[in-house]
Amino acid sequence: MSDATVERDAALFAPLARTGPGFYWTVAVLGLMILWGAVAYWTQFDQGLGVTGLQQPVSWGFYVTNFVFFIGISHAGTLISAILRLSKAEWRRPITRMAEVITVMVLFIGAGQILVDLGRPDRLMNVILYGRYQSPLLWDATSISAYLTASTLYLYLPLIPDIAILRDHLGKRRFLYSVLALGWTGTEHQQKVLNRAIAIMAVLVIPIAVSVHTVVSFVFSMTIQPMWHSSIFGPYFVAGAIFSGIAALIVAMAIIRRIYHLEAYLKPVHFRYLGYLLLVMTLLWFYLTFAEYLTGYYGNEPEEMKVFWAKFTGPFWPLFWAMVFCNLVLPMILLVRLQHHAIGKTVIASASVVVGMWLERFNIIVPTLSNPRLPFPEGHYWPTWVEWGETAGSFGLFILFYVLFVKLFPIISIWEIREGREAGLREVEERLRTYLPDGPYPAPGHEGAKAAT
C-alpha cells in the first residue's frame, strides 16, 4: 500500500499511534470492575456457592443468564458479517471487523460464565472425559468450542493484510506484526488464496453459529420444566441472538465513531441499514414471543399457567413488562421512520434492546425455576453482591478486551476500504460506458480517479 493511501486513511491509524488520557482512565475504570469481579469470584471459590442467591429450587440465576446473553451477542459478528460478505453488501466494509471482534471476545466471556457457575471448576474436564454424549451440556461444550475456533480464524484471515500494513508503516510493535503477518506481501496469488479462504469460512460459520444457540436452547427445552419444554425454543433463541447481536454492534459502532472521530467511515447510512435490520428482528422477536406465550396460555396446564401469571402479573411482572418495552415498544417508536436522526434513533433503540434481551434471558430462566413442576416450595431468588460483582467483572473484561484490540489493530479494515473504493470506481466506469460515448475514463488508482473520491 502506498504512502499516499496510508495518509488518506490516517484516521484509522490514529488509535494505534496515539494514546490519550481517556484511554488510561477507561482502562482504570474497567480494571476496578474486573477487580470487583475477581474479589467476588475468590469469595465464592473460597466459601462456596452459599455466598450467592442460588438455592433450591432456583439453582440458575445471573451466571446462566449472562451465559445465554453473551453467547447470543456473539451472533453480532460472525453470523452477520458472513451473511453480509456472501451477499456482497458493499456497505458492510467499515463494520465487519467490529462485529467479528465482538464475537470472539464475548465467546470467551460467555464460556467463562459456566466456570463461574460451577461449584467445583476443577472438575470441568469431567464434562469432556466422562460426559454422556446424549446430554445437551456436552453438545453445548462441543458447539461453543467449534464456534470459537471458527470465529477466531474468521477474524484473523481478513486481518492479515492490515497487519502487514502496520508492519510496513508503523514503527511500534513491528516484531509482533511481522510474526502475525505470516509473510504477507500482497501478491496476486496471496490475495486469491485469502479471498477463497474468507469465502469458505463465511459459508462454514453460518451453520455453526445457528447450531450454537440452537444447542443452548436444548439445555432448557429438553427438560419438562414449565415454559421450557417447547419446540419453538431453537428458532426463538437464534432469532433473539441475532436481535441482540445487531443491537450490540450498533452500540459499539456509535461509541467507536464518537471516540475516534470516524464519521467519514461510519456514516448515517450504516446506522440506517442496521436500523432496518433491527426493526425486522424486533417484529420477528415479537412474533415468536407472542406465539410461545399464546400457545402456553391456550394449553392452560396448571404448572405452565403458574409461571405464565408469575411473569404477567406476579412477582416478575416489572421485569417482564420492562423486557417488552425495551424489545418492542421503544424500538418500534424509534425505528419506524429513520429518514432523520438515524444515528441517534438506532443507538437509543439498540441500547434498549441490549438491556431488554438480558431481561428476556432472566425471564426465561428464573421464573420457571421459582415455580417448579416438582412439589418444591415456591422459590425466591435475589442476587448477592457476589453475583453483581461477577457480572460487572464480566462486562468490564469484555470491554477491556475490545479496547485493547482497538489499540493494537485497525478496528476498520483498511484493505477492504481501499478495495471498496476501487470496486466503486470500476462500477461507475462500466455504467458510464453503457450510455455515454467512449472516452478516456480514469482507471482506479489514476490521479483523476483519486480526485473523484
What are the roles of these predicted feature ranges?
Residues 59-122:
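Membrane helical hairpin/interfacial module
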Residues 68-72, 139-152, 317-328, 384-403:
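Hydrophobic alpha-helical transmembrane segments
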Residues 1-76, 402-403, 432-439, 452-453:
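N-terminal signal-anchor module of multipass membrane proteins
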